[in-house]
Amino acid sequence: MTDLSTLRFFRTPAHGCSYLEDRQASTLFVDPQAALSPELYSELSLLGFRRSGDYLYRPHCDSCNACIPARVRVDDFLPRRRHRRILKHNADLTVHREPARFSRELYTLYAAYINDRHGDGDMYPPSEEQFTNFLTCEWADTHFYGFREKGKLLAVAVTDQLNDGLSAVYTFFDPTLPERSLGVMALLWQIEQCQRLRLPYLYLGYWIRQCQKMSYKNQYQPLEILASGSWKEQSEPNDSGD
């Protein structure tokens, strides 16, 4: 186990929040010169850290704690009716482990996704450099899982393996196929992959109740959140019964 007290951290200046309007955000980064490894990553994930490229980070805002680390306890996960329908609809897809690096095929799908879904965000416009710097990593145990229909790439789940689970880093997919709900399908597959690997958790990143783009994560129960320094089960009512 790493002595975390020896690590150095760097905090960014305050800047506009990407998720909540009229709020200021700040991010805490692990010293990029530190000897980062999957083991250290696993330890820091228990404290709410995530990976972006070769960096480990977590929100560290002065006046806001809306970004709450979340993970699914996969052994107790029960898919909803909607989840079962989505899995059935995508049963024709095959899953392949792609090389975790830039390729023209992967980037073409990524760019189409960013252009369609994030044209008004700070990830637009996409670039090859952005793809590489955001998704690939020199030291992490990173996997690109590609979902294909008769050889055609429809979705990619960028997934990191940790000591106690998988971390769902990012998913991008063909935006012209909304009927497939490819983002949901990829997350459900990652839950199943945790079960196959006998890993107890799928780390989802940050749950933000007030942000529609991030609040969907409470659809995957049982969901645990990191609050006051410990992981606790978080439950949301499901009025739709779906």
Swiss-Prot record:
- Any one of the GO BP annotations: ubiquitin-dependent protein catabolic process via the N-end rule pathway
Give the highest taxon in the source lineage: Bacteria
Q: Which GO terms describe its cellular component?
A: cytoplasm
Instruction: Kindly give the InterPro entries that the UniProt entry links to this protein.
Output: Acyl_CoA_acyltransferase, Asp_Glu_LeuTrfase, N-end_Aminoacyl_Trfase, N-end_Aminoacyl_Trfase_C, N-end_Aminoacyl_Trfase_N
The record's GO molecular-function terms, alphabetically, read: arginyl-tRNA--protein transferase activity; leucyl-tRNA--protein transferase activity
Q: What reaction gets catalysed by this protein? A: N-terminal L-glutamyl-[protein] + L-leucyl-tRNA(Leu) = N-terminal L-leucyl-L-glutamyl-[protein] + tRNA(Leu) + H(+); N-terminal L-aspartyl-[protein] + L-leucyl-tRNA(Leu) = N-terminal L-leucyl-L-aspartyl-[protein] + tRNA(Leu) + H(+)
Would the keyword Cell division be found if you checked this record's keyword annotation?
A: no
Q: Which UniProt keywords apply?
A: Acyltransferase, Cytoplasm, Transferase
Q: Can you say where in the cell this protein is located? A: Cytoplasm
EC number of this enzyme:
2.3.2.29
Q: SUPFAM superfamilies per the record?
A: Acyl-CoA N-acyltransferases (Nat)
* One Pfam family cited in the UniProt record for this chain: ATE_C
The yes or no answer to whether the keyword Acyltransferase is present is yes
Q: Which NCBIfam families does the annotation name? A: PRK01305.1-1 (NF002341), PRK01305.1-3 (NF002342), PRK01305.2-2 (NF002345), PRK01305.2-3 (NF002346)
> Per the similarity annotation, which family is this?
Belongs to the R-transferase family. Bpt subfamily.
* Listed HAMAP family: Bpt (MF_00689)
> Which PANTHER family does the UniProt entry name for this protein?
ARGININE-TRNA-PROTEIN TRANSFERASE 1 (PTHR21367), ARGINYL-TRNA--PROTEIN TRANSFERASE 1 (PTHR21367:SF1)
What this chain does, per the entry, is described as: Functions in the N-end rule pathway of protein degradation where it conjugates Leu from its aminoacyl-tRNA to the N-termini of proteins containing an N-terminal aspartate or glutamate.
What is the official name of this protein in its record? Answer: Aspartate/glutamate leucyltransferase
